[in-house]
Amino acid sequence: MMKAVVDIETDSLDATKIHCIVAQHYRTGETRQWVGKECSQFGEWSGKIDQFIMHNGLSFDGPILNRLANARIKPEQIRDTLIESQLFNPVRDGGHSLEAWGNRLDYQKGKLNEFDDYSSEMLEYCIRDTELTRKLGVTLEEEGRTFSSQAYDLERQVRIIIDKQQDNGFAFNLMEGLVLLAQLQDEQYQLEAQANEMFKPTKVQLKTKVKYIPFNIASRKQIAERLVEKGWNPTKHTDKGNIIINEDVLSTIKDMPEAQMFSRYFLLQKRTGLLKSWIKECQDDERVHGRVLTLRTITGRMAHHKPNMAQVPAVSGQYLIRRLTS
């Protein structure tokens, strides 16, 4: 089987141009390079390779080589050292980047700040990355001896599906989202003003003066103190003895309208936070392309960011915002 370690340098993460490609024979270390217009010739050469060893090759290098270098690399041909690193130990100190592995293997990754145009320094940087990926491949072969090939194949297939999900994103009506955000924020401000009328500032006697601490409706500690003053007898506490205040607890206090007001405020906090994150990440195509890390935790659970799509409210929840995503 012909195996090659491959790395590329492009003009950006959303690449429109490949500046250079470097490939090394996995066993012998024999190196080949393609620069500028030569990159279009990579596709013909790549047809001789059975396995491509790349760091983040499934999500980045492979698709870009297929799109811009006339390659026809299949996902099952890619051995992705990023996925292997995450699979074999999801919580490595320092993370799973090639730079982090360079530090571990005492073969530091190069430094390069300018990617807009090709330079000889860029080629040296790419060569260094390829050499480091080769060393990493050997290291992970040894580390992964107790893992089956099926485990890697499964994670590869999951990554492919998630990449499609990220590329597609979901539709988001930005204008309606902005209107709804303004409505919810208006209600928040009204509840804040109402709370300040209900609960006057707390008087604190200092040595030489009196200090007044205004009521903060977002402070769970202050909410607990004021409800206790009104006769509430809390039954749920943290390990440190602090009173637990959340929507579930507040919803059980039926005889205090203040508790229902606080519960409502917490709901509005969550929904406005969610809306702000969606609005921030909405792209020109009017879609939100949330990022998903498939092997982020020791349990194998996925992690989400930009925005956190794991926090979408249930169908039964208030302000589901379904109309904004249809």
Predicted feature residues:
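A general structural motif
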Residues: 1, 48-50
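A generic alpha-helix structural signal
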Residues: 43-46, 181
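Conserved "right-hand" nucleotidyltransferase catalytic core of DNA-directed polymerases
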Residues: 1-9, 13-14, 22, 103-104, ...
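Short loop/turn elements that form and flank the Walker-type P-loop nucleotide-binding site
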Residues: 47-48, 326
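Active-site-proximal helix-loop-helix substrate-binding element of RNase H-like nuclease domains
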Residues: 14-19, 23-43, 50-144, 152-162
